[in-house]
């Protein structure tokens, strides 16, 4: 019993230690486009200004706002920094040749989560490649959770990949894409995203904490059977899944578009309200409806990963299916770990009088902090 209690308390201690930052992860967007003829490819690399500020410093006057003038003044240094961390090789008839990255210009663009530097360059290969090998090393020394989202466009085919610290290189055909590899990449990305999306995890825990108990006569009482608890879990998790799948699909297809700050603030608010409902139970019997309503907001947060890739057609379908499947796998893993432990402790005073309210207080405090920093300019 003490071991189980320590494990459960450790979950919240870890959450407190690692969840001070806002939800949106560090991503860059790299696009390589092969024309119908010739050996060269066009490259475009969108890198968040906040990441470049962290890496080399852009805010010359220290006012917290990076202007186009400040970015332009450091343009050559930004270009050198980025391109030195990207290697492209062309493969044709079994021969592998290094391709030269020739910078062209730099622009500014606004993504859903803020400003980005847009580096445009040419990938000059000795001969027209049938395959490309890409090695990506941007920001991993500063943020091992950084992701590079690679979109490759060739005549008749598009494909997308996710590059990470543990998977910095990828090799692919330009003419005949490996769709299964793309699907696997986005399944992995979905799993990573839910396990690193601490606000999503804590909202899920606010749904799972009461699953093994009932609020009757002014207090929490243990459910009588595991079947009853599992049915409650099935209802709330299914509702949450359906809801965030709907808004994820709508947002990635451009049918819903809300400012990132509004979405991230809304997610923090859902976590706070979920925690408060565990402390002061108002919604008791229809928690699945709450899970559905709040899940719509969480889906918009998931969409931030894919929305800026500009995918379409089969490429978009694979990314959506894979990413959503990965999110569900991650959620299922959390449920499978948490519910057996919670069910085993449900009859103890520790769970009903200490862990549930204590966990709700910790989650609520974190959510209130997130809400404050996300609403603030």
Where are these regions (language model features)?
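Membrane-interface motif at the C-terminal end of an N-terminal transmembrane signal
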Residues: 17-21, 373
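Hydrophobic alpha-helical transmembrane segments in multi-pass membrane proteins
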Residues: 189-377
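N-terminal soluble domains immediately following signal/targeting peptides that reside
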Residues: 20-195
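Bacterial N-terminal signal peptides
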Residues: 5-15
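Generic extreme N-terminus detector
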Residues: 4-5, 26
């Amino acid at each position: 019993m003490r071991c189980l209690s320590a494990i459960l308390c450790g979950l919240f201690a870890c959450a407190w230690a690692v969840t001070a930052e806002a939800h949106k992860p560090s991503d860059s967007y790299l696009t390589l486009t092969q024309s119908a003829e010739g050996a060269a490819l066009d490259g475009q690399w969108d890198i968040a200004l906040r990441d470049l500020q962290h890496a080399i410093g852009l805010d010359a006057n220290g006012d917290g706002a990076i202007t186009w003038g400040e970015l332009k003044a450091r343009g050559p240094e930004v270009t050198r920094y980025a391109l030195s961390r990207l290697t492209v090789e062309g493969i044709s008839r079994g021969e592998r040749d290094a391709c030269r990255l020739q910078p062209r210009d730099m622009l500014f663009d606004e993504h859903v989560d803020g400003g980005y530097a847009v580096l445009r360059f040419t990938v000059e290969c000795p001969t027209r490649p049938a395959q490309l090998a890409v090695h990506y090393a941007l920001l991993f020394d500063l943020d091992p959770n950084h992701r590079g989202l690679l979109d490759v466009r060739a005549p008749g085919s598009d494909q997308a990949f996710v590059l990470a610290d543990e998977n910095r290189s990828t090799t692919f055909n330009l003419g005949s894409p490996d769709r299964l590899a793309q699907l696997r990449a986005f399944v992995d990305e979905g799993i990573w995203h839910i396990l690193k999306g601490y606000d999503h995890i804590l909202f899920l825990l606010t749904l799972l904490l009461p699953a093994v108990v009932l609020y009757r006569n002014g207090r929490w009482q243990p459910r009588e059977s595991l079947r009853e608890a599992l049915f409650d879990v099935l209802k709330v998790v299914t509702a949450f899944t359906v809801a965030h799948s709907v808004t994820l699909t709508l947002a990635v297809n451009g049918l819903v578009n809300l400012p990132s700050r509004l979405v991230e603030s809304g997610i923090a608010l859902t976590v706070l309200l979920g925690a408060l409902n565990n402390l002061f139970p108002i919604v008791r019997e229809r928690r699945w409806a709450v899970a559905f309503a709040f899940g719509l907001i969480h889906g918009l947060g998931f969409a931030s990963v894919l929305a800026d890739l500009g995918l379409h057609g089969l490429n978009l379908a694979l990314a959506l299916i894979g990413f959503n499947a990965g999110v569900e796998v991650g959620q299922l893993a959390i449920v499978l770990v948490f519910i057996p432990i919670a069910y085993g402790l449900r009859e103890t005073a520790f769970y009903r009088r200490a862990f549930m309210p204590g966990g709700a207080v910790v989650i609520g405090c974190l959510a209130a902090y997130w809400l404050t920093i996300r609403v603030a300019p």
